[in-house]
Amino acid sequence: MTLEEKEEVSTSTSQSPQSSSFENVFCAICGDRATGKHYGAMSCDGCKGFFRRTIRKRHSYVCRFGEKCQVDKAKRNSCRKCRFDVCLRKGMRRDAVQTERDRIRPANPLSNGSNGGIVPDDPLLDTLIRAEASTRGLRTTVITKTAEARKQATTNDVTDSMNQQLTLMVEWAKVLEGFQRVDNITQVALLRHFSAQHLVMCAAFRSIHLSDAVWLTNETCLHKDSPKIPDMNRVAERIIDQVTNPMRSLHMNEIEYIALKAIAFFDPLAKGITSESYSDVEEMRQRILESFERHVRYVSPYKDMPLRFANLLLLLPPMLAISRDLVEDVQLAKLFGLASIDNLMLELMLPNEGKNTTDKTSPPIMCHQ
């Protein structure tokens, strides 16, 4: 074992003070416990150090086995060429090492109270982070693990995952300050308008470390080339190509994801919003946009900020378009009995077919636990 490999074993087996916050967050390269986002990718200290040494010392590697070696915690030192290639595929950037601009921050600022690069003294973003954290504890899976070996999703797996996400969305919305201020009819209108977009956005961001699949909350994967669920696979392919890949290219961080989700949620053009609540919704969206812009300015080089801000906002139109196709697929699944559609999904995504559309002032959605 080389000195460098001994150092990696040492850093992998000993926890830094920060690493205790990442007990369930995994390295995108080898699957070991991650200690943060390093050089553009979630990684452990071992892979972080390996990538840094490779770039700084300008190492060049050759694989003896056709560049098909498995890279995991146990075998990551077996082939440096394949390991380095995985580092690059997962988003590590040479320039982050060369210019020392890598901002090492927790990938999950919600788990340890860290602001993860948030603009100082921004109470609105702090509120959004707390809202996200309030539902994070309800999740039964960790969204940052790699999932190459995960089970192929069935139709029921897809709808089960959607049910879980919609339940979390309702609980998330209840915590939002702007949501609490509007009337019940507007609350339901916002939830219905955003429900499918929420599914698309969450699936896209959760799958940011995958290249050919959407990772669902119930530990299953929806691969874009699998023939099992052709309609859903087409949606998965669009999510990957039009949302996940751009998120990865932009190195979108969790604060930006949280803010963009809230911008999409508080849409003053959502069908069914009352005239009394319209200005409240519009004002809330404007406030979030301003905080979002300040955050992007804070974390981006000055010359890149306007383009980055625009590109992040340009993720919204494809998410809306994909969400409409997703609603159609759910409608077809219900029509032909292809999957179980629970009451919450029915009320949110197919309100015209639900059982409770007559009483708009006391919506069962808000009573869902």
UniProtKB/Swiss-Prot annotation:
Identification of the protein by name: Nuclear hormone receptor family member nhr-64
GO cellular component: nucleus
InterPro entries from the UniProt entry: HNF4-like_DBD, NHR-like_dom_sf, Nucl_hrmn_rcpt_lig-bd, Nuclear_hormone_rcpt_NR2, Nuclear_hrmn_rcpt, Retinoid-X_rcpt/HNF4, Znf_hrmn_rcpt, Znf_NHR/GATA
CDD domains: NR_DBD_HNF4A
Domain of life: Eukaryota
Gene (name only): nhr-64
BP GO annotations: cell differentiation; regulation of transcription by RNA polymerase II
Keywords: DNA-binding, Metal-binding, Nucleus, Receptor, Transcription, Transcription regulation, Zinc, Zinc-finger
PANTHER family the record matches: NUCLEAR HORMONE RECEPTOR
DNA-binding feature ranges: 67-142
Lineage: Eukaryota, Metazoa, Ecdysozoa, Nematoda, Chromadorea
Entry keyword annotation includes Nucleus: yes
